[in-house]
């Protein structure tokens, strides 16, 4: 029984194209209304008892079908045990106090989640994922689930995010359940960008799809995986606020790539643009050099001051942070009006220059009805 999980906005498109390919197929397509509290049990009952060739749901809807309480407890307890082992190992190796404190925070967070789950006073009559009878899980655009928490002793290394998205943790738990059920043959990922920002994302994909293999190889912990396949490199980069340059360490140099790719290709069918030979029109690129206005220069200087305050930790992260500063930098680079509605309409901003070019090309090609 297959469950197809796709981005929310294309569930109906997937259904239409599925029926175009397989007109006689019996498929079930879930809508947002189906996952409202009063309708969810009815939908889950249809999935569990129906003989469908496929059930198609959206990314956000997958979390609304939880694993059983007992399985969630077992998974959380296993994660807590792994953290305790890592803390013990870090203390034995006399790791930095910051690293150990970070691991302790992780342990407390997991224990709080386990305690909340153990609260039997919470009535739970939700149909669980196991009760649906799903034995094949297909995830389209799987890179949307890349924020899976990892533990590492590395500090201040770019490309190694230790933030966790709840939807990623939920999918990881379901992947482990299906691994047990199908001997690691029940999960399929599809994406055009398995690695978008950092090679750490390859490790994340392997945790989803090759958890048992990593365990057998002794590479289940990121630091072990990283020591086998890569190293950190420090280089001079433009600062996020654009006010100057600074040294930045990244997990960016790799070795033993043949061995890494051989392991990865045990579960991956890689198709590049050259292999697919898709009909792609030739692009003619034109570079437009846009000079900043005085107002933009002042705004960039303000970003630099904000960044210094963030680095010095004199501002609350909920008030200002590097992500917000970078986002403001992108906005002001396009048009100052994105930052302030009171800013003047600059005819030499990126947006204005782009609009003039689009109109000019449209006017010149009107006779051919070009787009």
Residue ranges and their predicted role:
Residues 1, 171, 203:
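Motif I (Walker A/P-loop) of helicase-class P-loop NTPases
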Residues 1, 366-371:
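Short, intrinsically disordered, charge-balanced linker/junction segments flanking boundaries
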Residues 2-27, 34, 60-64, 194-201:
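Conserved Walker A/P-loop ATP-binding site and its immediately adjacent core
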Residues 20-22, 71-75, 153-161, 204-208:
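Glycine-rich, phosphate-binding/catalytic loops in enzymes
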Residues 40-86, 92, 98, 105-136, ...:
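Inter-lobe coupling linker of SF2 helicases/translocases
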Residues 143-149:
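Short, solvent-exposed beta-strand-terminating loops
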């Amino acid at each position: 029984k297959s469950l197809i999980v796709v981005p929310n906005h294309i569930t109906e498109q997937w259904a239409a194209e599925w029926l175009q390919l397989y007109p006689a197929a019996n498929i079930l397509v879930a809508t947002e209304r189906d996952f409202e509290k009063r309708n969810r049990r009815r939908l889950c009952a249809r999935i569990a008892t129906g003989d469908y060739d496929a059930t198609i749901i959206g990314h956000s809807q997958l979390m609304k079908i939880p694993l059983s309480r007992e399985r969630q407890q077992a998974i959380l307890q296993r994660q807590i045990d792994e953290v305790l082992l890592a803390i013990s190992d870090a203390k034995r190796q006399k790791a930095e106090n910051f690293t150990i404190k970070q691991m302790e925070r992780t342990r407390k967070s997991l224990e709080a989640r386990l305690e909340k789950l153990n609260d039997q006073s919470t009535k739970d009559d939700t149909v669980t994922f196991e009760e649906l009878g799903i034995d094949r899980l297909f995830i389209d655009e799987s890179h949307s689930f890349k924020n899976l928490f990892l533990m590492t002793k590395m500090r201040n290394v770019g490309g190694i995010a230790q933030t966790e998205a709840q939807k990623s943790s939920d999918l990881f738990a379901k992947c482990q359940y299906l691994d047990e059920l199908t001997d690691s043959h029940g999960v399929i990922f599809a994406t055009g960008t398995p690695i978008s920002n950092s090679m750490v994302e390859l490790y994340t994909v392997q945790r989803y799809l090759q958890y048992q293999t990593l365990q057998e190889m002794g590479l289940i912990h990121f630091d072990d995986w990283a020591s086998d396949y890569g190293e950190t490199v420090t280089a001079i980069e433009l600062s996020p606020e654009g006010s100057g340059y600074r040294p930045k360490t990244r997990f960016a140099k790799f070795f033993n790539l043949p061995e890494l790719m051989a392991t990865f290709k045990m579960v991956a069918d890689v198709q590049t643009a050259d292999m697919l030979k898709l009909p792609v029109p030739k692009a003619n690129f034109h570079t437009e050099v846009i000079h900043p206005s005085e107002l933009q220069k002042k705004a960039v200087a303000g970003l630099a001051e904000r960044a210094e305050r963030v680095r010095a930790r004199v501002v609350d992260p909920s008030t200002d942070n590097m992500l917000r500063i970078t986002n403001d930098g992108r906005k002001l680079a396009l048009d100052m009006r994105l930052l302030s509605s009171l800013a003047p309409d600059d005819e030499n901003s990126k947006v204005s220059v782009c609009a003039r070019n689009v109109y000019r090309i449209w006017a010149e090609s009107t006779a051919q009805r070009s787009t």
